[in-house]
Amino acid sequence: MSTKNFRVSDGDWICPDKKCGNVNFARRTSCNRCGREKTTEAKMMKAGGTEIGKTLAEKSRGLFSANDWQCKTCGNVNWARRSECNMCNTPKYAKLEERTGYGGGFNERENVEYIEREESDGEYDEFGRKKKKYRGKPVGPASILKEVEDKESEGEDEEDEDGDLSKYKLDEDEDEDDADLSKYNLDASEEEDTNKKKKSNRRSRSKSRSSHSRSSSRSSSHSSSRSRSRSHSRSSSSSRSRSRSSSREHSRSRGSKSRSSSRSYRGSSTPRKRSYSSSRSSSSPERSKKRSRSRSSSSGDRKKRRSRSRSPERRRRSSSGSSHSGSRTSSKKK
């Protein structure tokens, strides 16, 4: 069979004999070269591409020939001499892979092989790793270690059973009951109690004294602070009273001055001077109050003076009237 006219179709199989390796058609049950029968070991062939044929070659107008083949995976058209695809490297004739299902995909769980694993009590597991319970122990044969441990445990049990009981004093309570009590001073306990009471009383007294002294010092400090605050308040009150008295004296002196000024300006009949003095007095509220007082006093003085001035005029008039009447009577007598 020439290689030029060799075409592989799906289902063709390769002879299982390594020396032969002939590719047989799918319809054959035995090898065409060596006559060996077809078995399950025979690998099936798979065509990675198909020839395009004459019709497609004519449509390409001389670009491709009828023997060129088209890849099944990527669809690229390759020359006839190529054994692999130029794009995806898929072989033109390949062996059919076995569908075991171990790698996933088609027929994934059909024929699954379960590995039977035996759990052993050995030092190492199935992967050759040392188990955790044996990691900290010294390296050695397991049988020897077990024998040594068994011997040690048996020896300890025998020692516990045959041990002397003399070290355990079982009659110790009875001996204590029958022992002499002469070595114990029973009266010493009472003396110790009295001494303890005295010491406690002394301590309580010293504590009470210290507390009393602390309280007295605190009270003295409080009283001193209070006296200081009182003296401070008194001094502040005295300073306040002084300031008040000085302000009163100052106001009185100002009032007397205003009164004297008002008296000096009484004789003048011009209203301008009075308005001038009133404008000066209105500069402050205190001056206005004092001026009002001085005005009231000046008005009272004016009334008194007017009444006084009128009274001598009346006297004069009365005296003149009396003199006229006397002269009239004297003239009548004449």
From Swiss-Prot:
Biased composition (Basic residues): 196-212, 302-318
Compositional bias ranges of the Acidic residues kind: 150-163
Major localization listed first in the record, in broad terms: nucleus
Stretches annotated zinc finger (RanBP2-type): 9-40, 65-94
Gene Ontology CC: nucleus
Domain of life per record: Eukaryota
Pfam families: Zn_ribbon_RanBP (PF00641)
Record GO biological process: RNA processing
GO molecular function: lipopolysaccharide binding; RNA binding; zinc ion binding
Subcellular location: Nucleus
Function of the protein: May regulate alternative splicing by interfering with constitutive 5'-splice site selection.
Family statement: Belongs to the ZRANB2 family.
UniProt domain comment: The RanBP2-type zinc fingers mediate binding to RNA.
Protein name, entry field: Zinc finger Ran-binding domain-containing protein 2
Organism in which the protein naturally occurs: Gallus gallus (Chicken)
